[in-house]
Amino acid sequence: MLVSYNWVKEFFQDFPLTAEELGEAITRTGIEIEGVEELSASLKNVVVGEVLSCERHPDAEKLNKCLVQTDEVEPVQIICGAPNVAAGQKVIVAKVGARLPGGLKIKRAKLRGEVSEGMICSLAELGFESKVVPKAYAEGIYVLPAHVETGVSAITLLGLDDAILDMAITPNRADALSMNGVAHEVGAIIHQKPAQPTEPDVSEKGKADDFISVEVENPAETPYYAIKMVENIEIKESPLWLQTKLMKAGIRPHNNVVDVTNYINLLYGQPLHSFDYDKIGSKKIVVRSAKEQEEITTLDGEKRTLQAGHTVITNGVEPIAIAGVMGGEFSEVTENTTTVALEGAIFSSSSIGKASRELYLRTEASIRYDKGSDAWKVEKALAHGGALIAELSGGTLVGGVVEVDNREKAVNKIETNLTRINRILGTAITLAEIETIFDRLGFVLEVKNDALIIEVPTRRWDITIEADILEEVARIYGYDEIPVTLPATSTTGGLSDSQKARRVMRAYLEGAGLNQALTYSLTSKKDATRLALSDEKTVALSMPMSEEHSHLRTSIVPQLIRSASYNIARKNMDVALYEMGTVFYATEGDNLPIEQEHLAGLITGNWHTVDWQKTPKPVDFFVLKGIIEGLVNKLGIKSELHWKQTEKEELHPGRTASLILEGQEIGYLGALHPAVEANYDLKETYVFEINVAALLDATKEKVVYHPIPRYPEMTRDLALLVDKNTDHATISQVIQEHGGKLLVDIELFDIFEGESLGENKKSLAYTLTFLDSERTLVEEDVQKATNKVIEALQEKLHAIIR
């Protein structure tokens, strides 16, 4: 927000700070000032002149030879190329020796043989941006009102002896999106009460009820709506003081009605809108929800298609404005307008923000409604706006307002105590200082025993909890006044078991060769349900920024697939990613969604880098399976991880398995379906996703120290011919159960399938390792254990020992 330093000073009788000092003081209290611009820093010798005569340059069709009276005794000749210059005008003159923005210095010169002693200026040449220059003067010089005295400083007249503070208003301080709000903030800083804006003293005639009535169909979306009438008006340029205030705030002046609505918006932070009463076509205004695909042409000339849920102002039949966003061209105030219906309203901030984003239409009004506003200042703003329009247009202010009021008045009281304030802020503030701070803020303080009860004015709707009160105390007391103190005793920090486990998981996966990815939690409706661990409903955003980010994810894998596709499109063919993040599932009613932490991974391409020592190895199911099993072992989980063949949409039906831990399904591992791979230009790609809570909650084994064995181990190799559907986990379990206490390790070292083995058969070869920590094993011990294993395999799995 652009804030005029001179306008701020108008609120106070004795202002003690320079513009630079004010900027620094506001920044110290929590509102960032991005810059302070002195408007007159590059201006000098610019005065009001009167064009006594104007004739065409004898040697140039587009130049005019003007005789101009300034503050000098004799008039001077100035050659001017502006198409709108004419005799009798009061204009802005940069005299010889004047300085203008951009480093331009005015010198006496000859133009096509004629002497020019100065320059008649446009507003752009004085430093105003072209977007704020009134359209009537966009292509030429600026013509001043006829009553302006010749020779006076144009810098002072145009308010350029000013500084502009560029305030970065954060969403929590929307109260500062008005000059009145800024004045209260400044008043708290300098410990002065700001003067309240006063409206012109204009008498009223007649009754607004005779002109119009109002109906609001949805009070929740429009808690307050009112119309103030002004008749017999004359549309013309606004006075210079109003135009310069608007231009310095970055707003283009239009006419004395529209400019007043913009001025009131700047002053109070309360948007107003003016309708040409005679164009409304009805004596009744109905505020309702838009119909699906209903259309309106807005003031910018664009035809806009509305959605159900957008609030519109109608004449009972068709929309004449999009509530809180922009008016309709149909009821626009023009030079022929004689009666104005002035709207002041409070709309739901969420609905206005939603409509603004969906229509891609952001205005000064929608910004303020979206961020929230003081619901109890609208009457004051409407009265001030109506009176000012009547004064500037010579119109008649109609008595009363037509309103629908469904607001609920509630006193905002927050309780705290001095001990708590000092403990949390680390200060030693006294009660007297607290009383002074709240007096400076304009808050009402009531002291009851140890309790401090603070009544917050409605202009500070951002303050709702005790923490907000403490922040206000810290701001006004001064952040730089809060002493820096070290804790009296040292507190030993430490990680929780779950934090340690997460670090172990990340370190293990990165050590295994996977790279950590961070993807968006927001996804499209299509991707929201893909490859999820659960069938729970998805969570849709009520106001999404785009269709691609309209839902909260239920699985991390789709985003990893997109990341892999992105990398491969850029010739990074070997991709190995993992992500530990949150997924979301909808709950019944308006309850918050269920949040679960998941671990997901993806590999594609080759697993090892190609060099002269290594042969490239394409990724496969078992690479990722081994990584997951290694992770479970690294976490010290006591129970064994089991794998169960399954089918899952978008995964290969023959290469997908569920992960079973302690009897519960905790995730899946599988190859992407060829059709999915084709959609993303991927080749052999494997993914997994696991519920992290299941890993963290699993029973852990205690770490027990075992000395290095003193006695040698013995090994036996077994080659088994089994049914093709018999998996490694089942075989390992049988071997483990019957191998006895001497069996310490089982290692699969070969799998073979072929026609020579017979139909639906496969061969698996294992190395069994035996060890006794107390004595040297003998052949008989190992053979006895091996025989038991063989018998069990033959009996339970019908295995044939090869």
Question: Language-model features: where?
Answer:
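Phosphate-backbone binding interfaces of nucleic-acid-interacting proteins
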Residues: 1-206, 341, 364, 368, ...
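Glycine/proline-enriched, intrinsically flexible loops and inter-domain linkers
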Residues: 24, 64, 195-294, 607
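Beta-rich nucleic-acid/ligand-interaction surfaces
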Residues: 41-44, 203-204, 490-496, 519-537, ...
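Conserved mixed alpha/beta core segments that line enzyme active sites in large multi-domain catalysts
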Residues: 48-78, 150, 255, 261-330
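Mobile "lid/hinge" segments at catalytic clefts and subdomain interfaces of large enzymes
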Residues: 112-131, 136-143, 155, 163, ...
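Extended, well-folded interaction surfaces typified by the phenylalanyl-tRNA synthetase beta subunit core
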Residues: 181, 414-418, 422-575, 716, ...
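Terminal amphipathic helices with adjacent charged low-complexity linkers/tails
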Residues: 190-216, 395-421, 428
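A carboxyl-terminal module marker
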Residues: 440-443, 594, 600, 608-802
